[in-house]
Curated annotation (Swiss-Prot):
Region (Cpn-10 domain), start-end ranges: 18-94
GO function terms (MF aspect): ATP binding; copper ion binding; protein folding chaperone
Organelle targeting peptide span: 1-17
InterPro entries: Chaperonin_GroES, Chaperonin_GroES_sf, Chaprnonin_Cpn10_CS, GroES-like_sf
This protein's UniProt keywords: Chaperone, Mitochondrion, Transit peptide
Secretion signal, residue range per the UniProt entry: none
The keyword Chaperone is assigned to this record: yes
Organism: Arabidopsis thaliana
Highest taxon above the source species: Eukaryota
Assembly, per entry: Forms stable complexes with CPN60 in the presence of ATP.
Protein name: 10 kDa chaperonin, mitochondrial
Amino acid sequence: MMKRLIPTFNRILVQRVIQPAKTESGILLPEKSSKLNSGKVIAVGPGSRDKDGKLIPVSVKEGDTVLLPEYGGTQVKLGENEYHLFRDEDVLGTLHED
């Protein structure tokens, strides 16, 4: 049984974050407002190479929370968990808590 998947090249393995359907105080949120396409980076590949063979590292690191496109990525199931593989350039941004 597989324990861990390490992506190749400039790919990242992401576990989508499921947004809660209601707030802590019990207010139900509309489906559209809770549909922020974000995920936690689980693993990253080493990066890709440019035309001169120089390594271009991946722009995110394990543990980052990233904003993802609504569609795309390759779905991967490891055990009971569901993940998605994206290319580094497909990530729309990194989310930070202030």
